[in-house]
């Protein structure tokens, strides 16, 4: 009992809570260990105390210690061993300690999968499994699944009168393939295996759709959605209450108050109905009627306040409108009919899943292999049996393990799943109040839901257990952080006290959850946490969203490079615990954390340009590496030489070494047939004198190829690979190239991959190539081979997930403005552990589809879980920092975002309103509103404190909040002052104060003039848009751009400029619609509106862009003479990309270089039509005309024609070169005013 626990020794460094976690026993114990709280040390100490307990010592092999990774298990064993050896020094005669050291290697300190394997190896005879089984390779597993599924579906297609199956196919597949159906079966199989009883979970999924005799109130989906209805109505009420407060201000629109009170009454009626039943809300929603606002004389009131009041009211109305449209536009009974109709189809789908699972298990059994989920389920099968009631209960084997283990200790408990929880439950005592289960973790760091981890298991116990442990389990909070400075902890607390709550975030960030200072640091300079929000540049992003992402990555990388270089150069100091002193920061002290790695290559490139050593363990790029790509093509040719593209790639590669002319010469010897056939034919004849060198190269390769093909039929794949490396000399060749060691390492990895493949159930070169194709199809490309150790003095770039458990003196968290990945919410079908299956209702006969109740509920639930998971990911990122935390994010429009974020100032509670937190689309949407309520926020100092209470406004944390103009980051930093004089002298070709024996040589080299200097000030690759700009620019070329880089000018961001969508964004949206208009359908408002909705669903347009599309203007084009010609044209091509070579003097007006220089020009032609008498080129424009030119279109026409003349001339030239046909007409079409300009040369 509690009073019998050993007292903490005098002078002990353990905190009271840590000591309690070390010695408490007699019940199940849950330790909520915050980041940096020393949980591993506590866990080791608890184990040691149990082993050396004088009254009741426990052998180490009577403890089951479950860790999250094999590395953690090994570290745990090492720590226990070291601790036991220290005890042995004090007690050299202790046989008990010696025994423990000998037992340690056999102790059950491992991952859950290793424990499962141990159980299965011991009791394999209870299963239908070969004891010599091996663990399946992931890709091998996927190939087997594909094989099994193909066989099952082929059988189903062959069954006559298989009505329900074909209805399933019609509803959930496209005309081209049944890939979607296959994905559904595999997803259901995977999700079911995350439950202790997969079949039972699948059966419940079908039962949920059996609504015979039920009302909508009986459905779990409806009850959950009603909670969401209450949430949204409460949000609407908050908007109206705030509007009322503003209206009652001295300069507020007081006449609005009466209407707002009526609004509150209406919302109150709806909220009351929501507390009753779905039917009540439905009926209330049919009677919603908003009062019309009374007209007021706006000059009598503060115009800004009036706008705010009206805006808040509109937001409230939009909340209700959204509910009406999504949930209450249909009668309750129509939702029930959806379930009735879908029930037999879903039943068939689940039957297919069960058949698949059975066949897949049988195939793995035949091949003597198991996967990781099999390990869990086989173990559970051994440890459990079925009771008379059909429930799972512990088996005789489980009871043996219960008797064996004195205690079961689980590390990282927050990442346990349902199956693992069941395994643990069966080997521990059955009573929480008298249990022997010790769990350690931090639910705030549970970030593996995508691996089916279930944080709800931790949360359930945390809510159920008490600190005293009376009548149940005990919970212990370890909140003291021994890792970080006060500034890091206080900054993290300040943010999470405002954003993490039970309703949104799944856990209250209360006093128990807050991080408390446990580490001592010397005074440091510049240790305040920072938020740097970058305003994206105003340059038009030609490449769309992808281009915008590239620019964001570049801007953030440039800013981080500048900061890292400045901190290193200035001697910024960090604390070194080993020497107990401050020391200058090193590159190894920095880490850049990202949510995912797509930006990593760009950040690495930018840091390298600044001379900063950097390392990232990239998970992609291996198969794109040149040397690997060439070798894969060699193997494709060995497998099947009739493939032209791989063969041409090999012939052109350094292995054979043909140039373009030689390749063309070979092709000219046989215009028909494959390259291989032409090569064979060419080698049979006697070569011409000028073709002898080509003949020798090809003969050498041809003979090698025949030998390799014969070798591949008889020998192993790995031997073949090494034979190719040796006989071509390619392995040695790449070793002599730049980054040669890296390239050779990549080729060795390919060899190792082949050896791993041959250890599977598959054999042969063809299967290996298919194996690699599957890896690439699944997006499982590997990173290039590691050629740099992680202990080097380099800046590290890693994902937040990879950083878990690590710590760094200086942490940059970048990409905070990137949107959360919500792709899972957009899938055609959704799966949830509690709510089962949800998809649209699809009627292929009527060709209609619409959202179902189950889909809405699951989507909402998954979104809230995603929000909670992203909060936890952010918590992990912020708590990696020891001394300095720098947060960086980029936004398109800082002014617009600030208007949204500053809403937080109007709330007086610590926890921000649910709708602000749940409505976040990126991390900045949480961080910025939180910091804009603190005194250190400059914008708050400008605009005032608002409703923020002093407790929040003056919270004891130090922040630097800054908005950085992206334009200033495009220019390099000024040259260091001490080098300026020398550089100026060199630039002016003056003598420099430096004596040298090679003075004359140095002088001659410095005086040397590059022969192609003119070309260095012009880009070798241009877009048509840039060339057009150059012609319009006073400076005439992008030479000005390069000059600007030499003289950086820093300007203040234009915060106060209010913007919606930019002209470029509007233009992009209109072009996207014109590209996708179905010309075979009648061009009506309904058709265009349906098309735009489809584009939004496919994420080709954003909602904001869709709202900006003037549909009537699109229709006007097709009603015009030019539009009718498009509809009647022989052929129509839209968004036609092109690349062509252009003389430099044609691209640059100021070109003074050598004639004959060319540049590469690329562009995209909006539309080209082919008519009987030739080709017409059309370019769509969204320029504003009406109201901009006093003289109307007559004044605008010559200006616009001159503006776009060069652009259309280049488009026409590109078409004429590629099609070998003249362009008869070049037209500009302006949507503003429905104007056409025919551009003449």
From Swiss-Prot:
Q: Which Pfam families match?
A: PDDEXK_1 (PF12705), UvrD-helicase (PF00580), UvrD_C (PF13361)
Annotated UvrD-like helicase ATP-binding domain ranges read 12-485
PANTHER family, per the entry: ATP-DEPENDENT HELICASE_NUCLEASE SUBUNIT A, UVRD / RECB / PCRA DNA HELICASE FAMILY MEMBER
What task does this protein carry out?
Answer: The heterodimer acts as both an ATP-dependent DNA helicase and an ATP-dependent, dual-direction single-stranded exonuclease. Recognizes the chi site generating a DNA molecule suitable for the initiation of homologous recombination. The AddA nuclease domain is required for chi fragment generation; this subunit has the helicase and 3' -> 5' nuclease activities.
Q: How does it assemble?
A: Heterodimer of AddA and AddB/RexB.
Q: What is its EC number?
A: 3.1.-.-, 5.6.2.4
Q: Which residues form a coiled coil?
A: none
Gene Ontology CC annotations of this record: cytosol; DNA helicase complex
Matching entries from InterPro entries are given as: AddA, DNA_helicase_UvrD-like_C, DNA_helicase_UvrD/REP, P-loop_NTPase, PDDEXK-like_dom_sf, PDDEXK_AddAB-type, Restrct_endonuc-II-like, UvrD-like_ATP-bd
Query: Per its record, what are the GO molecular function terms?
Result: 3'-5' DNA helicase activity; 3'-5' exonuclease activity; ATP binding; ATP hydrolysis activity; double-stranded DNA binding
What is the scientific name of the source organism? Bacillus cereus (strain AH187)
Catalytic reactions on record: Couples ATP hydrolysis with the unwinding of duplex DNA by translocating in the 3'-5' direction; ATP + H2O = ADP + phosphate + H(+)
| Keyword ATP-binding in annotation | yes
What residues does ATP bind to?
A: 33-40
Cofactors: Mg(2+)
GO BP of this protein: double-strand break repair via homologous recombination
All copies of the UvrD-like helicase C-terminal domain together span 505-805
What does the similarity note say?
Belongs to the helicase family. AddA subfamily.
Q: Which UniProt keywords apply?
A: ATP-binding, DNA damage, DNA repair, DNA-binding, Exonuclease, Helicase, Hydrolase, Isomerase, Nuclease, Nucleotide-binding
Name by which UniProt lists this protein: ATP-dependent helicase/nuclease subunit A
């Amino acid at each position: 009992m509690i009073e019998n626990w050993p007292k903490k020794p005098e002078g002990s460094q353990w905190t009271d809570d840590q000591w309690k976690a070390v010695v408490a026993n007699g019940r199940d114990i849950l330790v909520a260990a915050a980041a940096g709280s020393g949980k591993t040390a506590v866990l080791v100490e608890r184990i040691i105390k149990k082993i050396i307990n004088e009254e009741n010592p426990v052998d180490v092999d009577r403890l089951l210690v479950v860790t999250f990774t094999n590395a953690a298990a090994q570290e745990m064993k090492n720590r226990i061993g070291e601790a036991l050896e220290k005890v042995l020094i004090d007690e050299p005669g202790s046989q008990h300690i010696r025994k423990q050291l000998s037992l340690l290697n056999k102790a059950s300190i491992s991952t859950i999968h290793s424990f499962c394997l141990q159980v299965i190896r011991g009791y394999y005879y209870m299963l239908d499994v070969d004891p010599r089984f091996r663990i399946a390779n992931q890709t091998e597993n996927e190939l087997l699944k594909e094989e099994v599924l193909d066989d099952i579906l082929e059988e189903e297609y062959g069954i006559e009168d298989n009505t329900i199956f074909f209805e399933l196919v019609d509803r959930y597949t496209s005309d081209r393939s049944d890939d979607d159906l296959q994905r559904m079966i595999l997803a259901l199989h995977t999700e079911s295996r995350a439950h202790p009883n997969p079949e039972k979970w699948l059966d419940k999924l079908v039962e949920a759709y059996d609504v015979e005799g039920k009302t909508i109130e009986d459905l779990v989906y409806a009850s959950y959605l009603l909670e969401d209805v209450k949430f949204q109505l409460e949000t609407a009420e908050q908007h109206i209450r705030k509007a009322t407060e503003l209206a009652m201000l001295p300069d507020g629109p007081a006449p609005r108050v009466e209407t707002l009170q009526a609004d509150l009454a209406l919302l109150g009626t709806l909220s009351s109905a929501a507390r009753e039943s779905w039917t009540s809300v439905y009926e209330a929603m049919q009677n919603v009627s908003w009062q019309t606002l009374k007209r007021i004389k706006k000059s009598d009131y503060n115009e800004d306040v009036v706008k705010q009041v009206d805006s808040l009211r509109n937001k409230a109305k939009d909340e209700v409108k959204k509910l009406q449209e999504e949930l209450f536009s249909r009668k309750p009974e129509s939702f029930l009919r959806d379930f009735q109709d879908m029930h037999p189809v879903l039943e068939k789908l689940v039957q297919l899943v069960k058949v698949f699972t059975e066949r897949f298990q049988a195939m793995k059994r035949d091949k003597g292999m198991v996967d990781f989920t099999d390990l869990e389920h086989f173990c559970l099968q051994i440890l459990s049996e079925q009771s008379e009631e059909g429930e799972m209960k512990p088996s005789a084997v489980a009871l043996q393990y219960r008797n064996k283990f004195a205690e079961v200790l689980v590390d990282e408990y927050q990442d346990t799943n349902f199956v693992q929880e069941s395994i643990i439950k069966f080997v521990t005592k059955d009573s929480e109040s008298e249990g022997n289960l010790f769990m350690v973790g931090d639910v705030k760091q549970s970030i593996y839901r995508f691996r089916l981890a279930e944080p709800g298991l931790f949360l359930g116990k945390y809510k159920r257990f008490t600190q005293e442990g009376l009548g149940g389990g005990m919970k212990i909070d370890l909140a003291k952080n021994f890792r970080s400075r006060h500034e890091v902890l206080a900054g993290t607390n300040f943010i999470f006290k405002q954003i993490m709550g039970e309703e949104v975030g799944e856990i209250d960030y209360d006093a128990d959850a807050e991080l408390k200072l446990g580490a001592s640091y010397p005074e440091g300079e510049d240790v305040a946490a920072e938020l740097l929000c970058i305003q994206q540049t105003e340059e038009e992003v030609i490449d769309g969203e992808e281009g915008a992402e590239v620019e964001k990555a570049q801007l953030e990388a440039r800013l981080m490079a500048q900061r890292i270089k400045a901190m290193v150069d200035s001697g910024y100091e960090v604390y070194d615990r080993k020497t107990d002193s401050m020391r200058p920061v090193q590159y190894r002290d920095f880490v850049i954390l990202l949510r995912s790695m797509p930006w990593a290559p760009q950040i690495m490139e930018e840091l390298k340009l600044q001379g900063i050593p950097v390392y990232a363990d990239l998970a992609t790029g291996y198969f794109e590496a040149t040397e690997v790509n060439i070798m894969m093509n060699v193997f494709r040719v060995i497998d099947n030489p009739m493939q032209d593209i791989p063969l041409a790639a090999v012939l052109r590669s350094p292995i054979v070494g043909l140039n373009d002319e030689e390749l063309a010469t070979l092709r000219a010897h046989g215009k028909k047939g494959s390259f291989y056939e032409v090569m064979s034919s060419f080698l049979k004849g006697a070569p011409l004198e000028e073709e002898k060198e080509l003949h020798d190269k090809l003969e050498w390769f041809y003979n090698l190829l025949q030998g390799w093909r014969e070798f591949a039929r008889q020998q192993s794949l790995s031997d073949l690979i090494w034979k190719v490396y040796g006989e071509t000399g390619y392995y040695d060749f790449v070793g002599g190239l730049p980054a040669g060691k890296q390239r050779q390492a990549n080729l060795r990895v390919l060899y190792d991959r082949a050896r791993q493949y041959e250890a599977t159930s598959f054999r042969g070169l063809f299967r290996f190539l298919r194996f690699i194709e599957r890896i690439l199809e699944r997006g499982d490309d590997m990173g290039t081979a590691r050629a740099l150790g992680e202990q080097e003095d380099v800046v590290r770039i890693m994902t937040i997930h990879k950083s878990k458990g690590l710590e760094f003196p200086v942490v940059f968290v970048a990409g905070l403005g990137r949107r959360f990945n919500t792709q899972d919410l957009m899938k055609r079908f959704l799966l949830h552990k509690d709510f089962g299956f949800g998809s649209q209702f699809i009627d292929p006969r009527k060709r209609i589809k619409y959202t179902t109740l189950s889909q809405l509920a699951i989507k909402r639930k998954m979104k809230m879980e995603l929000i909670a998971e992203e909060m936890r990911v952010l918590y992990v990122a912020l708590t990696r920092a020891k001394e300095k935390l720098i947060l960086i994010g980029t936004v398109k429009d800082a002014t617009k975002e600030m208007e949204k974020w500053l809403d937080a100032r109007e709330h007086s509670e610590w926890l921000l309103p649910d709708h602000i937190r749940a409505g976040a689309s990126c991390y900045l949407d949480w961080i910025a509103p939180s910091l804009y309520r603190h005194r250190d926020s400059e914008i708050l100092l400008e605009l005032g404190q608002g409703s923020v209470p002093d407790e929040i406004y003056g919270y004891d944390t130090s922040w630097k909040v800054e908005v950085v103009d992206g334009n200033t980051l495009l220019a390099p930093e000024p040259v260091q002052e001490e080098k300026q004089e020398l550089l100026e002298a060199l630039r002016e070709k003056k003598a420099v104060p430096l004596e040298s024996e090679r003075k004359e040589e140095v002088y001659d080299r410095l005086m040397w003039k590059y022969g192609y200097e003119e070309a260095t000030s012009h880009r070798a690759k241009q877009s048509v848009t840039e060339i057009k700009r150059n012609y319009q620019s006073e400076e005439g070329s992008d030479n000005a751009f390069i000059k600007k880089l030499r003289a950086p000018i820093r300007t203040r961001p234009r915060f106060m400029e209010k913007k919606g969508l930019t002209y470029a964004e509007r233009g992009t949206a209109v072009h996207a619609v014109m590209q996708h208009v179905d010309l075979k359908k009648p061009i009506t408002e309904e058709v265009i509106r349906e098309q735009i909705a489809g584009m939004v669903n496919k994420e080709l347009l954003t909602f904001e862009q869709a709202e900006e599309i003037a549909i009537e203007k699109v229709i006007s084009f097709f009603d015009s003479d030019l539009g009718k010609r498009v509809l009647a044209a022989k052929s129509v091509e839209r968004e036609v990309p092109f690349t062509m070579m252009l003389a430099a003097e044609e691209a640059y007006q100021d070109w003074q270089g050598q004639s004959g220089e060319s540049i590469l020009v690329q562009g995209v032609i909006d539309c080209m039509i082919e008519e009987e008498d030739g080709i017409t080129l059309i370019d769509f424009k969204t320029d504003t005309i009406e109201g901009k030119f006093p003289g109307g279109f007559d004044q605008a026409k010559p200006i616009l024609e001159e503006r776009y003349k060069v652009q259309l001339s280049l488009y026409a030239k590109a078409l004429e070169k590629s099609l070998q046909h003249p362009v008869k007409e070049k037209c500009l079409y302006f949507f503003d005013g429905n104007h056409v300009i025919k551009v003449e040369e």
